[in-house]
Amino acid sequence: MAIDKLPLLLFLSILLCLNRPVLSDTDEEDILLTGINSYRTTQNLTILSKNENAECLADEIADQFKNKPCTNDTGSATVPGTEPQFANYPQILAKCHLNVSDTRDGSIMPACVPRLESNLVLTNFTKSQYSMSLNDSKFTGIGIGKEDDWIVVVLTTNTPEGSYSTATPTKQESNGFTFGIGLVSYLVIFMYSSFCFFLF
């Protein structure tokens, strides 16, 4: 009797191990990307595609603003030419495997919005000095990072000076990690099914 249930048990075990839950996490970054691309569509511009290296830089820049309060002279309200300068900018670029020549034509736009309320976040980019960059057709890619009340948008171009393209793609690294987990799962399933086979 138990041997009759073995194929069903094996099938269910394999099915459970292969079934990887997909987490649907709609966050401020995704909402902002959708809003910016909708805005660009209404301006008859192409949508911006995600750029992982720009996203890395946006995350690192947002981290620099950690615990910095929102004021009338921070973020999108900053007077041009008075933007914060980071002494460790070369190290920030290095963390993302970038250098100054790969980012020269790009644009870094920080905004501070209490609790990152989505409508206000989008307005901080579309109804401020940042709208000039969003309306510029030279930009083709985007990276978004956030920390506390800060959200940073990095725009990229398709030129060598603004492509943010020198980093090793993180997808390759993560695919290797996924493959490693998948291989372990298959080995565990194989060992489990072999054990069950010899047990009965």
Curated annotation (Swiss-Prot):
PANTHER family: OS07G0645000 PROTEIN
GPI-anchor amidated serine: lipidated positions: 174
InterPro entries recorded: At5g19230-like (IPR045285)
Membrane topology value: Lipid-anchor; GPI-anchor
Carbohydrate attachment residues: 44, 72, 99, 124, 135
Residues that make up the propeptide removed upon maturation: 175-200
Signal sequence, start to end: 1-24
Keyword check for DNA damage: no
Major location category of this protein: membrane
Location in the cell: Cell membrane
Native source species: Arabidopsis thaliana
This protein's record includes keyword Transferase: no
Keywords, comma-separated and alphabetical: Cell membrane, Glycoprotein, GPI-anchor, Lipoprotein, Membrane, Signal
Gene Ontology cellular-component annotations: cytosol; plasma membrane; side of membrane
Cysteine disulfide links: none
Protein name, per record: Uncharacterized GPI-anchored protein At3g06035
Protein family according to the UniProt entry: Belongs to the UPF0277 family.
